[in-house]
Amino acid sequence: MNIRKEIVIIGGGPAGMAAALGAVEQGVEPQDILILERDAQLGGILNQCIHNGFGLHTFKEELTGPEYASRYRRQVEAKQIPYKLHTMVMSLRSGRGEDGYDKEIIAMNKEDGMLMIYA
């Protein structure tokens, strides 16, 4: 399967989700973004951090890691930013490629098989 996107974010942890949301705030259309996450859900390591202390700066309240990740996940879903879970990036190449894209990403998952992603 070939996919073309303006922005591809490798990793759906808090930084990846924040990058996607920031791109939308800067005018990038959500459908021009793709988040690739190897785990079963967005949130990264925060899903394992059950202690409080997250979110004071961003959400103005103290949250556990899973709560913080869930807030970001809901924002990503509300903006309809596409993402692929259980997706492992196998290769990333730079340089002008197909149709003038700068990056070629090879990834795979059980649902789609081999993915050729151009960004």
Predicted regions and their residues:
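Phosphate-binding P-loop
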Residues: 2
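Beta1-alpha1 glycine-rich phosphate/pyrophosphate-binding loop at the start
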Residues: 5-71, 75
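Feature captures the FAD/FMN-dependent oxidoreductase FAD-binding
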Residues: 64-119
